[in-house]
Amino acid sequence: MKRFYFDLAGALTACDRMGHQCASRREAKEHARFIAHRIAAVRPPFAQPGNYIRVRDENGVEIFEIPIHVGPGYSMRQVA
């Protein structure tokens, strides 16, 4: 299992220092979607354009971003 890091980025930032082990990039995407959905549900003011979860791999390389927004479906911007 590889460790991925899920940072809060945008108007308010927070760096994930512990990370989370995932079996694959696909699983990391699902975990990032879960985090984004949870933040939007618990803290609706954070669900704004420009706020997202930035996912980094074990080497600190950004691999994709998941927007934090309210509503069905999620989009994803591939970085690497």
Go through each PLM region and give its residues:
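Short aromatic-glycine-(Arg/Gly/Cys) micro-motifs in beta-strand/loop hairpins
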Residues: 1-16
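A structural detector for beta-sheet-dominated domains
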Residues: 9, 23, 69-71
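A short, exposed loop/beta-hairpin motif centered on an aromatic-Gly-Thr core
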Residues: 14-25
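A short, charged, amphipathic alpha-helix used as a generic interaction element across diverse proteins
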Residues: 24-44
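C-terminal structural segments of small proteins and small subunits
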Residues: 44-45, 50-80
